[in-house]
Structure formats: structure tokens, C-alpha cells
């Protein structure tokens, strides 16, 4: 993860680091703990714009203060019809689409990330896996510098 953080700082547009107090307050507010990847990322930078600055930034890793349930970010309604309460929008990818963190599951101690397509949310058929961890997602974005739908290619 450290080489990814170095690259974000060197080649992209990181925000100032989150303080330990901000991280603690965030975890208290949402009721889940950051996994090891996120615990490394947020003290390094409390969000970042990847590839280019806004407007037009293809990947905006959200600051802790902007992370909300995916159903609120995508549909504007905190209701179960719009997906599980355990899904959180962590990265804005333009046009109302997000990359979503599934805090209801862990793989090797890390939360998987899924596609939070505005058009299809919360249909799991169309909103499939993006990465098994935040570090895998970040590495794919930094390596390919391509949009969400081509990360696996």
C-alpha cells in the first residue's frame, strides 16, 4: 500500500490527511471500522482526485466527511429498497456513479468494492465486483488510468 500512497502523492491530487480524531469520529458515526487499506489511506490523505482535477476528475476518492451509504449517495433515500445499509459510496466516478465499499463482507480482512452504477443500482446483476480490496482498486486505477468499466482489461 505504501507504494500506492507515494504515487498518489507524487502524480495525483491528494487532500490533506485525516487526523486520528477525524478517523475515530467517522468510525463512531458509521458503526464500522476502516480496514487496513483504508486505515493506511486516510491518515495519508483524506480523499484524492485521481488522474486530473475537478471538473472532469474520473475518480474522486471521497473524504471521510462525504462518505455516506450508497443508497443515499446514489438514490438520495436511506431506504432498504435502494440497497443494503452496509454499502457505502467511497469513490465518485462521474455522472452519479460511484465505487461502493461493502462493509457487510470482508475478504482477507478487507472490504470488497462494487460498481455503484446510478442506472442499475442496486441490482447485483449489473452492479458487480470492481475489486476485492481498496488497494486492488487503487492499483488498478493508477495502473490503467482508465474509467471504471475498463479496470479489469
Predicted region positions:
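A short alpha->loop->secondary-structure connector
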Residues: 106-110
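Secondary-structure boundary/capping motif
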Residues: 85-86, 115-117
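Residues in well-ordered beta-strands of folded domains
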Residues: 91, 102, 114
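Compact, glycine/acidic-enriched structural inserts
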Residues: 116-138, 142
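A surface-exposed partner-binding patch
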Residues: 1-98, 149-153
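Broad, structure-driven detector of short, well-ordered beta-strand segments within folded domains
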Residues: 97-105
